[in-house]
Amino acid sequence: MNIVSVSWGDHISFGEGDGKLDTPEKLRRRLAVWRDELGAGAVHWRMLRSRIPGTYSAAPGYRHPSETAARGQGWDDFEIVPAMAREASLSPWLYVTVWDEGWPLAPEQVRRVSYHNEMHGQHVAWQSDLTRDHPQWLTVDGAGRERQLGVVSLAYPEARHAFVQRWMGLIEPTEFDGLFVCLRSQSRPADTADQFGFNEPARRDFLDRYGIDVTREAFVIDAWRDLLGSYLTALIGELRVALERAGKRLAIGGARGDVVGPPLGNATLPWRDWVRLNLVDRLVINQNSSQCPSMWHQLWPMHRGTGYVQNYLDGTGLPSLAEHVSETYRPVIADSRVKLFVARQWCERSPEAEARLCATPGVAGLVFGSFRHDNPDAVRRNDWRAGRLPRDDQQRR
C-alpha cells in the first residue's frame, strides 16, 4: 500500500483542471486516480494555512498565495475529504507540521538577498499567532541573540501542550483516521548545524543532569544533541496519549538517519525509541526540507548550513537508501507493529527503482506527491510565479 501526499494549497494556487482540486467533484475524480495509478491506500491531506491562527503580511503590490487560496472555497475539506476518501477506499489522514510556524516579513534590503523563493515567497510572509504570542519559544543560539524564526523549542512543556491542543482541536471533530506530523521546515536554514536549541529549559535540564552550563562551558555535544531530541519524543508521547483517547492513529515523517538534519540541526532523531515504545503507527523516511515537493524549487538557496553529521543534501554520513533501509531500519521495524514508508516526492518517477524499494523487506509502501502527478503541463512549464497583485488591485490598496 502506498500513500499520496496532498498539499491542497499548492493545487489551488498552481493546479489546472481537475488538478486544481477546487471542487469536491474534482477531488472525487482524483482520489480514484491516486488509488488506481499510484497504488494509494491512504491520503495525507495538508490543509490550508488559514486553519492555523496567524497573520499574513506582504510588501506593497503583493498578496500571500496562501491567503488567496483560502478565499472562495465554498466547501469544508475537513468534512468532504474523509468521506470521499473512504468512498474511494483510501484511509484519510490529516497532515500537520511542528517546525513550520512562519516568520514576519523581512525588510526590503534583506529580502533582496535572502528569501524563501523568488517566484512566490520573496515579498510575502506568514507567522503563527503561537510564535507571535510566545517569541521566547523560538529556538535560540548559545549567546541568546539570534533565533531561528518558525522553529519552536520543544523543551518548553507549555509549547508541547500548545501543539497537542492545536492538533487535537483540528482532528478530534473530524473523521480523519489519524494525524501525520511532518518534521519538514520551510524556515531559513541555520548557518551551522549546532547553532540553535539553547533555550532556558534545555540549558537548565543539561545543567541538572551533567552539572554543565552549555552557554558558558565546554560540553559533550552528543549528550546535548540527545537531550534536544528527547523533547521531540516527549511531544510525540504526549500526542500519542491524546490521539489514543480520541481513537486516532499517529504517523511521523522526517529525514532518514539519526539527526533531524537540514535546515534545523544535529538534534538526535530518536526514531528507534518511538518504535520501541510503540509511540507511532507509521514512520515515513527520506523527506527533504530544502526542496518544495510540489514544484521542486529550492528553498532558501542562498543559505546552506554546515556541520551536519548526517546530511541528505550531499550524502554526508548516510549510506545508500537501499542499504539504510535493509541494514538499519528493517531490524528495528521487524519486531514491531510500526509500518515503514519511504517518501518519493523528491524523486523522478522510476518504476524499476520503486519496485525495488517496495520489494525491500521492511518497507510497507511508498509516499508519492499528488501535485506533480495531477499537473504535468504545469510542471513542464515550470512557472510558479504568484502573489503579485493586478494593477487595479494595487491601486485599490
Regions found by a protein language model. Give the residues of each.
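Aromatic-lined substrate-binding rim segments of carbohydrate-active enzymes
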Residues: L31, R49-T97, V220-A246, W300
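Aromatic-lined carbohydrate-recognition surfaces of secreted/lumenal glycan-active proteins
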Residues: S5-S7, S91-W103, F180-S187, A223-A267, ...
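Substrate-binding cleft of secreted/luminal carbohydrate-active enzymes
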Residues: G41-R46, R272-Q298, T306, D314-R397
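Active-site-adjacent "subsite" loops/lids of carbohydrate-active enzymes
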Residues: N2-D22, W93-G169, P173
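Aromatic- and acidic-residue-enriched segments that line the glycan-binding/catalytic groove
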Residues: G54-T68, D100-R145, L183-T215
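The substrate-binding groove and active-site-proximal loops of carbohydrate-active enzymes
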Residues: G9-D22, A59-W75, E146-V164, A218-Y231, ...
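Aromatic-lined carbohydrate-binding/catalytic grooves of carbohydrate-active enzymes
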Residues: L38-Q73, T192-G197, S289-V309
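Catalytic domains of carbohydrate-active enzymes, especially glycoside hydrolases
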Residues: E25-S57, L170-L179, D273, L279-I285, ...
